[in-house]
Amino acid sequence: LEMNLPNAVVETVDVRQRDQIAEAVTNGEAAHGPVDMMFVNAGIARLADIGRQPPEEWDEMIDINTKGVMNTVHAVMKGMMERRRGTIFMMSSIAGRKVYPDHTVYCGTKYFVHAVSESLRDYLSDYNVRVIVLSPGVIETEVLSGVLDQQTLADYKANKIKMGGGISAEIVADLILNAYNYPQEAIVQEICITPTRQKF
C-alpha cells in the first residue's frame, strides 16, 4: 500500500450503497476483529451560487453527505451497542455551525451531521458508546476538487490565501487520536479547530 500499512484492509465502496459499507465492515472485522472506532467521513463539497447551481449537485451532496453518513453509522452501531464499547467520529464542518456564501446545500448537510451527532450521542451514551463530532475550518485536503463552479473556487482560494492557508490534516488527525485515547468513560463531545487567522 502507498501508506505502508501492510495489515490494512482496503475496500472501495459507494457510501450511498448501505450493503457495500456493511460488506466492507464485515471484511475488516473478519481480518482484525470488531470495529472499535469508525471515522464517518462521507462528504463532498459542491460549492456554488445557489441561484445558478444545478439541482443535481444538491442531490449528490444530500445523498453522500447525509445518507452516506447514516449508512456508515448503521454498519457499526449495532455491534458497538452489543459490546457496549466503541467510538464514532462524525466529520462535520464549521459549516455545520454557521452559514457561508456559496455553501447553501453543503451547510445544510453539515447541520444535518451536527444534529444527528447530538441525537446519536444522547442515544448511544446508554450503551457506553461515544459519538464525537468534528467541526474543522479550512484544512489542507482535496475537498476543493469537488468544487465545479470556477468563480466560487477562485473566491475560496483567495480567502484561503488571505488567512495564510489551511491547517494540515495531520493536526486534525492528532486531535482525533488524542480524543480516542481517552478512557471509554470520558468523551470530548466536539472538536472545533480552524486556522488562527480564519475569521469566519
Spans of model-derived segments:
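Substrate-binding pocket helix/loop in short-chain dehydrogenase/reductase
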Residues: 49-50, 54-62
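Active-site helix of classical SDR
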Residues: 73, 109
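C-terminal helical subdomain
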Residues: 129, 133-134, 154-199
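Active-site loop immediately N-terminal to the catalytic Tyr-X3-Lys motif
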Residues: 51, 98-104
